[in-house]
Structure formats: C-alpha cells, structure tokens
Amino acid sequence: MRMLLHLSLLGLGAAYVSAIAVENTMNRLVAETLTLLSIHRTLLIGDGNLMISTPVHTNHQLCIEEVFQGIDTLKNQTARGDAVEKLFQNLSLIKEYIDRQKKNCGGERWRVTQFLDYLQVFLGVINTEWTMES
C-alpha cells in the first residue's frame, strides 16, 4: 500500500512537471511570436489596404476563432518568405495548442454540486479577469 502511495505521488509530480514544461514552452513561443510580430509589422502591413475583420470585443477569450480567421487572411495575403514564415509557424503552433486545450471543455457528467463548483469558479474568472463592456 505504501508503495502504491509513493507511485501515485510520483505520477502526480511527473504530471505537474510536464504541465509546467508545456506552459513554459508556450510562454516562450508566445513571447517569440510577439517579438516577430513587432519586427515584421511593416512588412505585414504592406500597402495598408488589406481589410481584416477585427473583433471589437475586448474579451479575447471569446473571439479566438475570429482572431485565427484574421491570421489566415493575413497569411494568405502576405508575400511568402523566410522573414515571416517563422511568425506564421508559431501562430499555427499556438492555434494547435488552443485547439487541444478546447478539447478539455467537454466533460463527463458529474453531480450537480461539482457543476455548481465549476460554475462558481467560472463566474469568478469573468468577474475578475474579463473586461466588462457596456
């Protein structure tokens, strides 16, 4: 029994370390992408005539699909080349990561108390992390 407890704790520790590693990797990828976006902004703007649907909403979590549609439009209208290729590769990796995370939204059926606990946390996030628009 003691060995089982040790193995369980070891497994939890490994999962935690793995989650931290993925989070750190994603943080570095986003930071690199922001740098590339700054560096290549003028090239991406081009002649400035490209019109891309841009969300008005400031709660970016709600507009993920629209943001990535805009990225696809920008990618299709930008001259290919090594200069921006890494930027678009990074954006694709970020989208893949978000898509994988969205798969965690579908869950199992739990008792109402667990759902209410989740709902309470969800509303707390909306209350503290989202900008409320009028």
Curated annotation (Swiss-Prot):
Gene Ontology molecular function terms on file: cytokine activity; growth factor activity; interleukin-5 receptor binding
The residues the entry assigns to the signal sequence are 1-21
Q: Which Gene3D superfamilies match?
A: 1.20.1250.10
Q: Which Pfam families match?
A: IL5
Where located? Secreted
Give the main location: secreted
Alphabetical GO CC annotations of the entry are: extracellular space
Q: Which residues are glycosylated?
A: 76, 90
User: What's the superkingdom here?
Assistant: Eukaryota
For this protein, the record's SUPFAM superfamilies field holds:
4-helical cytokines
GO-annotated biological processes:
immune response; interleukin-5-mediated signaling pathway; positive regulation of DNA-templated transcription; positive regulation of immunoglobulin production; positive regulation of podosome assembly
Q: Does the keyword Secreted apply?
A: yes
Entry keyword annotation includes Cytoplasm: no
InterPro entries, sorted: 4_helix_cytokine-like_core (IPR009079), IL-5 (IPR000186)
Key words of the record = Cytokine, Disulfide bond, Glycoprotein, Growth factor, Secreted, Signal
Task: Give the similarity note.
Answer: Belongs to the IL-5 family.
Whom does it interact with, and what assembly results? Homodimer; disulfide-linked. Interacts with IL5RA. Interacts with CSF2RB.
Q: Which protein, by its recorded name, is this?
A: Interleukin-5
